[in-house]
Design a protein with these regions (language model features):
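Amphipathic protein-protein interaction modules
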Residues: 72-116
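Short, compact, well-ordered microdomains
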Residues: 103-106, 110-137
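N-terminal, charge-rich interaction modules
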Residues: 1-80
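Residues in well-ordered beta-strands of folded domains
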Residues: 57, 90, 108-110, 130, ...
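A short secondary-structure junction signal
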Residues: 67-68, 119, 140-143
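A general structural signal for short secondary-structure junctions and capping/turn motifs
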Residues: 45-47, 99, 119-122
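Short proline/glycine- and acidic-rich turn/helix-capping motifs at secondary-structure junctions
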Residues: 96, 133-147
Length: 147
C-alpha cells in the first residue's frame, strides 16, 4: 500500500493562486489570500466575534469537474451540515487569478475548529481547505488520504 495521495504540484499552485472571497455584507467583499495576512479579514472575524474560520466547498470533489446539479446538491448538504453543527457561515467563492479556472462557490465557516473543518473537507472529498485565524496569515491545509 502506498502513502496518502496528495494533489499535484500544479493543483496546489492553483489553490494558492486563488482569491477566496467572502460577502461580508451586501456591499463589502473580503478577500482571503493564502499566506497573506490582511487586517480586513481580522476585522471581519472580530465583527462576527470569532477567532477562526475556514473556507470550505463541496464543489468538484478531488478537484475533478463535476456536473452543476451534483455540485449544487453537495453544496446544499455542506451548508446543512454547518447548520446542524451550529456553525454560522458567509457565502463566498474561490476566484482563480488564472482566468481558465472557473469560479467555485464556497462558504466561510465562522468560528469552526480546525478539526471540524478538516472533517467536513474530507466528508466532501476536498483536497484542501483554507484555514483562517485572526492575527495570522491564512493557511492552505491539505487533506491527505482521501482516495
Amino acid at each position: 500500500m502506498g502513502g496518502p495521495l496528495l494533489p499535484s504540484p500544479e493543483l496546489i499552485t492553483a489553490y494558492r493562486n486563488t482569491d477566496y472571497q467572502a460577502d461580508a455584507s451586501p456591499t463589502v467583499t473580503v478577500t482571503v489570500r493564502i499566506d497573506l495576512h490582511d487586517p480586513a479579514v481580522d476585522g471581519l472575524l472580530q465583527s462576527r466575534k470569532v477567532g477562526t474560520a475556514a473556507f470550505l466547498t463541496a464543489f468538484n470533489p478531488l478537484s475533478e469537474p463535476t456536473g452543476d446539479a451534483a455540485n449544487a446538491r453537495a453544496q446544499e448538504c455542506l451548508v446543512r451540515d454547518l447548520a446542524i453543527l451550529g456553525i454560522a457561515h458567509i457565502a463566498g467563492r474561490g476566484v482563480g487569478r488564472d482566468e481558465t479556472w472557473p469560479i467555485e462557490p464556497s462558504v466561510l465557516a465562522l468560528g469552526i475548529s480546525r478539526v471540524a473543518a478538516e472533517e467536513l473537507a474530507r466528508r466532501y472529498r476536498q483536497n484542501a481547505f483554507v484555514w483562517v485565524e485572526r492575527g495570522k496569515a491564512p493557511e492552505l491545509v491539505l487533506t491527505s488520504g482521501l482516495r
